[in-house]
A protein has these predicted regions:
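Charged, flexible cofactor/metal-binding loops and thiol motifs
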Residues: 121, 143, 151, 157-311, ...
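Generic, well-ordered alpha-helical scaffold segments in large soluble proteins
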Residues: 40, 61, 65-68, 90, ...
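A local structural micro-motif
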Residues: 52-53, 150, 183, 220, ...
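Short runs of predominantly hydrophobic/aromatic residues within well-ordered alpha helices
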Residues: 37, 84, 88, 234-237, ...
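Positions in alpha-helical segments
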Residues: 39-42, 118, 122, 235-239, ...
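Glycine-rich cofactor/substrate-binding loops
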Residues: 1-36, 97-98, 279-435
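A helix-coil-helix interface module used to build multimeric assemblies
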Residues: 1-201, 206-213, 274-275, 286, ...
Length: 435
């Protein structure tokens, strides 16, 4: 069945059909396509555009088709152009002419646009639920190792002492903002394009508010060209997916480092690690590495769809068929990563003694040493210089600030006294900063 037959005197070449088809991508929207058609048919009957009898046949036929697809009794034909064509063709074959009346006052342009919004309306809560699950896993890990001291880094150099809870808390805050981005995008997306027609609405006396309400939208899109021709809602969700995956990638990068012998701050559970085919000693953080890699894939989905949309004139263009490949892949990848990483993090064991040992090295308390001199009245820049000289002295003599005799301190600046040792104690450094 071709929805656009009549104008053409030849059958489309098989290569044309194959290239034009989107059934492999959009078949997942069969439920949403049926939901949209039920709302549309019910509205047509309520407005007297089709008969109640035809409407009843349409609704019953669509319900049967849905049940048969779900049960596996009806297989979606992979040679059909798209899911919309398949369902309408199947409906017409079952109920006859009544099925041909379903598309009255509707175009595939607004049909596709409402289907994808309906699908994503259901998909977004799945993603936000998984984000909340990852937040819970991170929060549990932060509480488990709340008082574990570790180095804080800048430029991947040891900078100042912090707690593990503070470090993980940064990712929790990032993920909470990610939640907000998905929720905001879902709110802006929640308006129905149904009734926009091909681009200029329809001459039939349809009720767009009725179908919008029936489908759970907050309202309908007032400009019909906008309704069928923009995919900013897909772009916005892909933007949220991309930022989320950047945060996930950064977290995974740190987990990968922490699990290395060079850091040895953490160890992943065997159930969430892999080995090597040749090196018996290896325990690889493959899940974290894969998630880090998949961040590029999701960012690519966003860049691809942005590039597709940037040069399109109003209204609908076939280029926009690429929207579903991008948004479905982006959302699917995000869900897959969150599903895999949450239990990996929940079962991850930290190694506090190694973290504490690392925090004790690298003169990580030098800023606190300088602040001690400031508390004695020395200007910060002078205190900074004096502490830098102390660090150089320690490096030359192979000692630490904690081990350096007070006489050596006083040789650099006479304002030093025994209180400096309390000031540079790691626990005190962390406590004073409220970390």
């Amino acid at each position: 069945m071709k929805l656009w037959a009549g104008r053409f005197s030849k059958e489309a070449d098989k290569k044309t059909n194959d290239f034009n088809s989107s059934i492999k991508t959009d078949s997942r929207m069969f439920n949403e396509d049926i939901d949209g058609s039920i709302a549309h048919a019910s509205m047509l009957a309520a407005k007297g555009i089709i008969s109640e009898e035809d409407c009843k046949k349409i609704l019953a036929g669509l319900s049967d088709i849905r049940n048969d697809i779900i049960s596996g009794e009806l297989m979606i034909d992979p040679d059909t152009e798209d899911i919309h064509t398949f369902i309408e063709g199947e409906l017409t074959s079952r109920i006859g002419d009544a099925g041909k009346r379903l598309h009255t006052g509707r175009s595939r342009n607004d049909q596709v646009a409402v289907d994808i919004r309906l699908y994503l309306k259901k998909d977004v809560p799945q993603v936000t639920g998984l984000i909340n699950g990852l937040i819970d896993a991170l929060d549990g890990k932060a509480k488990e190792y709340a008082h574990c001291i570790m180095p804080g880094y800048t430029h991947l150099q040891r900078a100042q002492p912090i707690t593990f809870a503070a470090h993980i808390g940064a990712y929790i805050e990032m993920l909470r903002r990610d939640l907000g981005r998905f929720e905001d995008a879902a709110g802006r997306m929640n308006y129905s394009p149904l009734g926009s027609g091909a681009l200029a609405g329809t001459t039939y006396p349809i009720d767009r508010a009725m179908t919008a309400k029936a489908l759970g939208f907050d309202g309908y899109m007032p400009n019909t060209l906008d309704g069928v021709s923009d995919r900013d809602f897909c772009l916005e969700l892909l933007g949220a997916c991309s930022i989320l995956m950047v945060h996930i990638s950064r977290l995974c990068e740190e987990i990968i480092m922490w699990c290395s012998w060079e850091f040895k701050f953490a160890e992943l559970d065997d159930a969430f690690s892999t080995g090597s085919s040749i090196m018996p000693q290896k325990k690889n953080p493959d899940l974290a590495e894969l998630a880090r890699g998949k961040a590029g894939r999701v960012i690519g989905d966003l860049c691809g769809l942005l590039t597709t949309m940037k040069g399109l004139p109003l209204a609908y263009n076939k280029d926009m068929q690429e929207d579903k490949d991008a948004i479905f892949d982006g959302m699917d990848t995000v869900k897959m990563c969150l599903t895999a990483l949450t239990p990996m993090i929940a079962t991850m064991k930290m190694i506090p003694e190694n973290m504490r040992k690392a925090a004790a090295g690298g003169f990580i308390n030098a800023t606190d040493c300088a602040d001690f001199l400031v508390s004695k009245g020395l200007p910060f820049r002078d205190a900074y210089k004096a502490t830098g000289e102390l660090v150089a002295l320690c490096i030359k003599s192979g000692t630490t600030l904690e081990e350096l005799p007070i006489d050596e301190y006083k040789s650099i600046c006479p304002l030093f006294d025994e209180g400096v040792y309390d000031a540079i104690n790691l626990e005190n450094c962390v406590t004073r900063r409220g970390m």
